[in-house]
From Swiss-Prot:
Oligomer status and interactors: Part of the 30S ribosomal subunit.
Cofactor(s) it depends on: Zn(2+)
UniProt-listed InterPro entries: Ribosomal_eS27 (IPR000592), Ribosomal_eS27_Zn-bd_dom_sf (IPR023407), Ribosomal_zn-bd (IPR011332)
GO CC terms in record: cytosolic small ribosomal subunit
Annotated residues for binding of Zn(2+): C20, C23, C39, C42
An annotated Gene Ontology molecular function: structural constituent of ribosome
A Gene Ontology BP annotation from the UniProt entry: translation
Protein name: Small ribosomal subunit protein eS27
Amino acid sequence: MALPKNLIPMPRSRFLRVKCIDCGNEQIVFSHPATPVRCLVCGATLVEPTGGKGIIKAKVLEVLE
């Protein structure tokens, strides 16, 4: 009987490096936030929570592992 390769599944959530559309500030955010994530410089909303994966309103530059 063959065992599966991964007994523990990898999480589907990731950290993202995003760029604010209003001011150009780069910030690291979580892909599944529980609260709204705002830009630290101008206060614009970058990610809105939805009970699962958040709605990303900024430009995603990189997906961090």
